[in-house]
C-alpha cells in the first residue's frame, strides 16, 4: 500500500490542500459514487485510492468490487508470464473475438512495468486479477502480486515438517482468495496436513483443516481452481486419482480416473478437463475427458482430430464457446502465436502476440484475466 501511495503522491487528482473539493466529492451519495467510479479504467481506479479514506473504503468494499468485475467481463485479457534467465516478465493483451472461419489475428501485448521481477517463478497461477508465485522448495517465499498496481505480499512461512505443495484458489461464496498447503510427512505413515490461508486485510495466518477423513496421499505439481474447487492429480492407495479440495467448505474428496496418469488439467467450459500427456504423441488426435459428476465419478470422453499447426503445443483451456486454446510452453518466442481451435466447426484462428522478448525459458498463458484495482 505504501508503495502505491508513493507512486501517485506527486500527481494526485486531489491534493491535501483541496479540502473544499474533497468535502464536496465525499458528499456525493455512496451508491452514485460507486456507479461513477465503476466507469473508469483500472489504472485510474488505482490512483483513486489516494483521494480520501472514504474513496479507499468504497474501492475496497465488496459492492464496488462485484460491480466493477461484472462490468469488466467484456474486458477480459490474455495474460502471459515469461521467465527470461532469472527475470520474470509479465504481459497482457486484449482477448480477441474469434471469427467463424480459419483466420489470423495480431494483438499487441503490453508489459506490467511495476511488476517485481526477482521473485520465485516455478509455480505461477493467474486468478481473478492476482498472480501467485512460488517454488517447489518450501524454504523459498510465496508471493502474491497484483500486476496492475505493483503491490505484492509475502506469505508467512509454515513450520510443519515434510514435503509441501501450495495452490492458489478463490472461494466464490465468501469472495476471498485462499492458499492451500498440503504437507505429507517423510516417514510415510501419518495422514496429510492441510492448511489454508485466507487473503484478507489484517493478520494473515495459516489455519489447519481438521478433517478426520483426510488420508495420506501425494499430489502432482499441476493444479487448477474451477468454481471454488481445486483439482490436482494425486496418488492414493496405489493408483492415480483426482483430489478435490472445495474452498467453499474446506473439505477433501477423491474422483476415480480409471487408470489414467500423467494428466494435464484444464478448464473445459467451467468443468474439469483432463488430457493424458504422451511425450511421443504429435497431437494429431486429442483424447480428453470432462468431469460431469464428481460424486458419481462420471466422466465424458471426447476425441477430435487436430490440425498440424497445433502439433506439439500445450492445451491451455477450452473456452465457453468451444475453442481449444493452445500455447507454446517455451523456447523461441519470435514470433509468438497462440491458437484457438473450434471443435465443432473444425476451424482455427492463429493469434500472433507482439511485444515479447525473443527468448524465454518458459511461458505461462492464461485466459480471461481481469485487471483488478483492489489492493491486497
From Swiss-Prot:
PROSITE patterns: FBOX (PS50181). PANTHER family: BNAA05G37150D PROTEIN-RELATED, F-BOX DOMAIN-CONTAINING PROTEIN. This is Putative F-box protein At1g53370. It holds the Pfam family FBA_3. It comes from the Eukaryota. Residues 22-71 form the F-box domain.
Amino acid at each position: 500500500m505504501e508503495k502505491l501511495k508513493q507512486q501517485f503522491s506527486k500527481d494526485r487528482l486531489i491534493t491535501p490542500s483541496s479540502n473544499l473539493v474533497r468535502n464536496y466529492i465525499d458528499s456525493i451519495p455512496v451508491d452514485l459514487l460507486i456507479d461513477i467510479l465503476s466507469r473508469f479504467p483500472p489504472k485510474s481506479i488505482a490512483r483513486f485510492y489516494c483521494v480520501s479514506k472514504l474513496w479507499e473504503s468504497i474501492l475496497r468494499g465488496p459492492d464496488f468490487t462485484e460491480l466493477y468485475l461484472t462490468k469488466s467481463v467484456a474486458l477480459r485479457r490474455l495474460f502471459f508470464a515469461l521467465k527470461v534467465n532469472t527475470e520474470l516478465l509479465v504481459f497482457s493483451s486484449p482477448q480477441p473475438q474469434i471469427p467463424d472461419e480459419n483466420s489470423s489475428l495480431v494483438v499487441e501485448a503490453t508489459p506490467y512495468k511495476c511488476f517485481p521481477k526477482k521473485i520465485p517463478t516455478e509455480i505461477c497461477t493467474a486468478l481473478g486479477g492476482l498472480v501467485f508465485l512460488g517454488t517447489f522448495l518450501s524454504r523459498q517465499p510465496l508471493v502474491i502480486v497484483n500486476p496492475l498496481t505493483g503491490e505484492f505480499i509475502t506469505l508467512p512461512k509454515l513450520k510443519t515438517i515434510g514435503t509441501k505443495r501450495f495452490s492458489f484458489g478463490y472461494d466464490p461464496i465468501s469472495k476471498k482468495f485462499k492458499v492451500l498447503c498440503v504437507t505429507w510427512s517423510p516417514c510415510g505413515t501419518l495422514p496429510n496436513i492441510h492448511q489454508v490461508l485466507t487473503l484478507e486485510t489484517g493478520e494473515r495466518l495459516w489455519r489447519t483443516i481438521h478433517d478426520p477423513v483426510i488420508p495420506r496421499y501425494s499430489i502432482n505439481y499441476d493444479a487448477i481452481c474451477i468454481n471454488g474447487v481445486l483439482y490436482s492429480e494425486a496418488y492414493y492407495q496405489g493408483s492415480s486419482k483426482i483430489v478435490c479440495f472445495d474452498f467453499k467448505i474446506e473439505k477433501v474428496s477423491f474422483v476415480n480416473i480409471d487408470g489414467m496418469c500423467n494428466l494435464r488439467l484444464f478448464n473445459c467450459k467451467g468443468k474439469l478437463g483432463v488430457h493424458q500427456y504422451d511425450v511421443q504423441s504429435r497431437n494429431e488426435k486429442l483424447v480428453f475427458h470432462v468431469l460431469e459428476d464428481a460424486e458419481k465419478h462420471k466422466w465424458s470422453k471426447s476425441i477430435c482430430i487436430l490440425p498440424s499447426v497445433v502439433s506439439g503445443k500445450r492445451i491451455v483451456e477450452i473456452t465457453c464457446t468451444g475453442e481449444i486454446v493452445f500455447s507454446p510452453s517455451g523456447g523461441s518466442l519470435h514470433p509468438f502465436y497462440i491458437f484457438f481451435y473450434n471443435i465443432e466447426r473444425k476451424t482455427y484462428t492463429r493469434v500472433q502476440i507482439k511485444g515479447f522478448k525473443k527468448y524465454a525459458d518458459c511461458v505461462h498463458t492464461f485466459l480471461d484475466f481481469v485487471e483488478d484495482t483492489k489492493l491486497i
